[in-house]
Amino acid sequence: MSRIGKKPVSVPAGVTAAIEGKTLSVKGPKGTLSISLADEVSYAIEDGSISVQPINETKRARSFWGMQRTLVQNLITGVTEGYSKTLQITGVGYRANVQGKNLKLQLGYSHDVDFAIPEGITIATPDQTTVQISGIDKQKVGQVAAEIRRWRKPEPYKGKGIKYAGEYIFRKEGKKK
């Protein structure tokens, strides 16, 4: 039994959900999101909530049960509140700024890195060493943050690089004489 899957997902006021064929669409104040539905799980919209139940008791159906319920919850949270991630840049001369549809990163390379901002994602730079990524799709926000971080991961000796806000970097001791 999935403890997560048992709980129905409540649909708040101002949000509409509809099942059309094998697609669940959710529309809210921030936009519209949709996912394709799994065949192993049945979905029902009733009384302002969406319930997810496995069709049979196979291991595959039970494993999809909790995951699909969480994906539905992510859709509803995305269209009501949205998601955001914050990256911090550490290092001498390392900086970032938004220029039009591109994020320009100076990360100690011989050239600047231009990162094209994808559709549906908003990137802001409150200061030169902070990058805020926000959007309504949780997966897309996390993927963009990971792609930006990949350009210069934090190194363990001085901690230079791009890290998530609140991320702990395990520091190593340097050479000894």
Swiss-Prot record:
Pfam families hit by this protein: Ribosomal_L6
Corresponding gene? rplF
Sorted UniProt keywords? Ribonucleoprotein, Ribosomal protein, RNA-binding, rRNA-binding
Family per UniProt? Belongs to the universal ribosomal protein uL6 family.
Subunit and interaction comment:
Part of the 50S ribosomal subunit.
What GO molecular function annotations does the UniProt record carry, in alphabetical order? rRNA binding; structural constituent of ribosome
Alphabetically, which GO biological process terms does the record hold? cytoplasmic translation
Lineage start: Bacteria, Pseudomonadati, Pseudomonadota, Alphaproteobacteria, Sphingomonadales
Protein name (database record):
Large ribosomal subunit protein uL6
Task: Mention any one GO cellular component term assigned to this protein in its UniProt record.
Answer: cytosolic large ribosomal subunit
Q: What does this protein do?
A: This protein binds to the 23S rRNA, and is important in its secondary structure. It is located near the subunit interface in the base of the L7/L12 stalk, and near the tRNA binding site of the peptidyltransferase center.
